[in-house]
Amino acid sequence: MIKKIAVVTGASSGFGMLTALELAKNGYEVIATMRDQKRNTTLLSEANSSGIADNITIHELDVTSAESVSLFKELVGRVGQVDVLVNNAGFAGAGFVEEIPIDEYRSQFETNVFGAIAVTQAVLPIMRKKSKGKIINVSSISGRVGFPGLSPYVSSKYALEGWSESLRLEVKSFGIDVILVEPGSFQTNIWTRGKKVTENSLKKESPYYEMMRKLEDHIESGSSKFENPKNVARLITAIALKNKPTMRYAIGRGVKMTLLFKMLVPWTIFEKIVLSKLR
């Protein structure tokens, strides 16, 4: 049986961990990467209990470090094959534009955008030589719809979307597919431990303090309705197994309706609805 190799970044938790497990269950040999290998406990425990531990190897990878990416490139070079790359590593920067230091924007883009680019550049030569491969980029509905207080995250996902479109057109003729997965709200730590709010917007003297508080309340009040992240992992795995995947896969309660609504109604109406969520 011909082995299939998948690489998943940000695999210590959330979509990344669940996707690594799901791919392994479906016959892939998974290279699960994470910035801190000490956070591999849950992944290893789940893999052992599911009887798929032999299908998963864990490697340290900081997508923002040139040295770390170089070591990763050497690793996949030795393996000589990558059938699927899942660019999942990321976090959510929050706060209001006037108050966010430019370095925090840079940090957001270093992980969510430049990190994905660096890892993709490491595997593309292998995929191109094999004339096959799938690059699945985990975006978000935030890559299609803006929201106040989340401009670092939103802008990084918009950038990922545009880059993915260009990349798909560049590598299609080499037998490589580039796919975007756009989740809505799911039960991961992206809005808890994975969220980094600029300190200035948390100060009571901030002119945006009330809006920041309402944003936090909005996220917290909706958390009970967040969906099972395993659904996203299953979708990513289905895409990996699909012969001719399309460009975008939106997933989550109300996501497709929101995208359609934004496309059809005048912006003035759409913005009133968005702003009403923070009243």
Language model feature labels by segment:
Residues 58, 100, 108-109:
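A hydrophobic alpha-helix adjacent to the NAD(P)-binding/active-site core of NAD(P)-dependent oxidoreductases
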Residues 12-14:
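Conserved glycine-rich cofactor-binding loop
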Residues 96-97, 104-106:
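Substrate-binding pocket helix/loop in short-chain dehydrogenase/reductase
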Residues 140:
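Residue(s) in the substrate-gating loop at a strand-loop-helix junction
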Residues 120, 156:
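Active-site helix of classical SDR
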Residues 50-67:
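Rossmann-fold cofactor-recognition segment
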